[in-house]
Curated annotation (Swiss-Prot):
Any one biological process term the GO annotation gives: L-tryptophan biosynthetic process
Protein family (similarity comment): Belongs to the TrpC family.
PROSITE patterns the record matches: IGPS
GO-annotated molecular function: indole-3-glycerol-phosphate synthase activity; phosphoribosylanthranilate isomerase activity
The protein's Enzyme Commission number: 4.1.1.48
Domain of life where this protein originates: Bacteria
Swiss-Prot/TrEMBL keywords: Amino-acid biosynthesis, Aromatic amino acid biosynthesis, Decarboxylase, Lyase, Tryptophan biosynthesis
Pathway this chain belongs to: Amino-acid biosynthesis; L-tryptophan biosynthesis; L-tryptophan from chorismate: step 4/5
Recorded name of the encoding gene: trpC
Protein name: Indole-3-glycerol phosphate synthase
Keyword Lyase listed: yes
Species of the source: Streptococcus sanguinis (strain SK36)
C-alpha cells in the first residue's frame, strides 16, 4: 500500500464532488438512534457489520457477494448497524449498494466513504443512510465541525473516526457523540489493535466508542470489549464461510 493513500483518495474525492450535483433533500429513513442503542445495551459488545467487496490493502475480498442477502443476515443475527462502502474506485462499492440495503433492513445504515462535502451528506441521506462517517485525518477541525453540524442538522448521526490522541481530542471538542478508533493507520495502512487499547484511557462517559479494523476473532473482540460499546467488522464477515457463526463469535457478553 502506498504511503500516499489518504492524499490520493482525497484528491479523487475532490474530483468526484466537483462533478456532483446538489440533490433535493428526501425524507429521512426511520430507524432507532445508534447512540441511544449503544448506550442502552452495554451488557454486550455490539457489532457494526460491514458490506465491503474490496479494499486497497487486501484487493478483492468478496466480489460475488449478494449484498442484500449479506445485509439481511447481519440484521437477523443481531447487528446494531450495517456499514456500507460506497467508494467505487478504491473499495469497489457504490451508492446504489447503500440504497438497496437501506430499503431492505430496518436497522441503521452507515455511509462508509471519505466525506468532504455537504453534497455527499445529502446523497447519503437520500440513499437511506441514517449515519455518516467523518474522518478527522481527512479534514481540518473547522471543516469537520461544519460537516458534523450540517449532518446532525439533517437528522443524521455521525461516526467520527480517529486514530491517535490528538484526533480523539478533536472529536471530543466538536461534540461528537459516536467516536470510532480506527486501528488502521490511513497513511501506512498497517493495523495495530493496541491503538484502541491505548486511546481508551482518554474516553468520556457520555460518549460511545467503536473499535474499527483489525477485529477478526473472538480473542480480538475480547481485548477491546471492556472499553468499547461496539466493534466495526468488515473483512472477517465478508470472508466468513458461516456469517451467522462469525457474528455470534464476535458479540462478546460483557456481563
Amino acid at each position: 500500500m502506498s504511503k500516499e493513500f489518504l492524499p490520493t483518495i482525497l484528491k479523487q474525492k475532490e474530483q468526484e464532488v466537483a462533478a456532483m450535483s446538489y440533490e433535493e433533500l428526501q425524507p429521512l429513513r426511520s430507524t432507532y438512534s445508534l447512540y441511544e442503542y449503544l448506550k442502552n445495551h452495554p451488557q454486550e459488545l455490539q457489532l457494526i457489520a460491514e458490506v465491503k467487496k474490496a479494499s486497497p490493502s487486501l484487493g478483492d475480498i468478496n466480489l460475488g457477494v449478494d449484498i442484500v442477502e449479506q445485509a439481511r443476515t447481519y440484521e437477523r443475527c443481531g447487528a446494531a448497524m450495517i456499514s456500507v462502502l460506497t467508494d467505487e474506485i478504491f473499495f469497489k462499492g457504490h451508492l446504489d449498494y447503500l440504497r438497496e440495503i437501506s430499503s431492505q433492513v430496518t436497522i441503521p445504515t452507515l455511509n462508509k466513504d471519505f466525506i468532504i462535502d455537504e453534497k455527499q451528506i445529502v446523497r447519503a441521506r437520500n440513499a437511506g443512510a441514517t449515519v455518516i462517517l467523518l474522518i478527522v485525518a481527512a479534514l481540518s477541525e473547522k471543516r469537520l465541525q461544519e460537516l458534523y453540524d450540517f449532518a446532525t442538522g439533517l437528522g443524521l448521526e455521525v461516526l467520527v473516526e480517529t486514530h491517535n490522541l490528538a484526533e480523539l481530542e478533536t472529536a471530543h471538542r466538536i461534540g461528537a457523540q459516536i467516536i470510532g478508533v480506527n486501528n488502521r493507520n490511513l497513511v501506512t495502512f498497517e493495523t495495530d489493535i493496541n491503538t484502541s487499547l491505548q486511546l481508551s484511557a482518554h474516553f468520556k462517559d457520555d460518549r460511545v466508542y467503536v473499535s474499527e479494523s483489525a477485529i477478526f476473532s473472538k480473542e480480538d473482540a475480547e481485548l477491546v470489549a471492556p472499553y468499547f460499546h461496539a466493534v466495526l467488522v468488515g473483512t472477517a464477515l465478508m470472508q466468513a464461510e458461516n456469517v451467522a457463526e462469525k457474528i455470534k463469535e464476535l458479540k462478546i457478553d460483557k456481563g
